[in-house]
């Protein structure tokens, strides 16, 4: 820490003066704390959404079987089955997170993510809504099971919409906090990393390249990143 250098550390450049460094340190720590909170909120929202959506595939199978067990026509069943199949679809490969995708791309690995069906959460909510709308027009669909009734399904649709919305909002917050962190740490000239380099150069000029003081700070490594 430059505090240990006392009055000997006395640069003329405003951005590397002790008070400026302390202020920047506080700002950087706050941005990191806010990012950690945003990451936790996003993870919690994703976990909650996964839990809410988990029973959907089995539920739509029950819905379809309930319809088939009624007096509905074969053509009606086929129309409903089209939507049901979309809700039951599977990915050709597991979906990776955007964070993992970026890390792979930084390593020069191109990531192709091909979906075999409409399994994004947005499309599942949309298709579930289409299924409910279609069922509401089918007079024969009148199950006695509470969890299969239209009103119950509509309540579930509202819950799924909200659950998905919470993830979207948490994702936006996470992205904004990550950009804020990157700006504070990696901006050219005004970012913490560039200012730290400037401070190290000043210490080198004051104490010398072979001095214990410079050796102490020269060991500190700062990774640069394009903002």
Description of each model-found segment:
Residues 1-227:
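Basic/polar low-complexity intrinsically disordered segments
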């Amino acid at each position: 820490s430059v505090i240990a250098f006392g009055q000997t550390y006395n640069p003329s450049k405003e951005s590397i003066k002790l008070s400026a460094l302390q202020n920047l340190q506080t700002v950087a720590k706050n941005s990191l704390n806010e990012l950690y909170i945003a990451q936790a909120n996003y993870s919690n929202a994703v976990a909650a959404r996964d839990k809410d959506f988990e029973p959907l595939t089995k539920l739509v199978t029950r819905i379809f079987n309930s319809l088939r067990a009624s007096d509905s026509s074969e053509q009606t069943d086929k129309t409903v089955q089209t939507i049901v199949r979309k809700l039951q679809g599977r990915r050709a490969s597991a979906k990776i997170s955007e964070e993992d995708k970026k890390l792979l791309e930084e390593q020069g690995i191109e990531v192709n993510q091909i979906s075999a069906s409409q399994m994004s959460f947005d499309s599942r909510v949309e298709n579930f809504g289409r299924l409910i709308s279609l069922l509401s027009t089918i007079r024969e669909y009148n199950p006695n099971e509470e969890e299969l009734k239209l009103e119950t399904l509509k309540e579930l649709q509202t819950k799924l919409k909200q659950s998905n919305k919470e993830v979207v909002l948490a994702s936006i917050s996470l992205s904004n906090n990550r950009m804020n962190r990157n700006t504070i740490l990696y901006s050219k000239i005004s970012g913490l990393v560039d200012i730290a380099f400037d401070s190290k150069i000043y210490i080198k000029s004051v104490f010398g390249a072979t001095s214990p003081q410079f050796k102490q700070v020269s060991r500190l490594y700062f990774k640069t990143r394009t903002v």
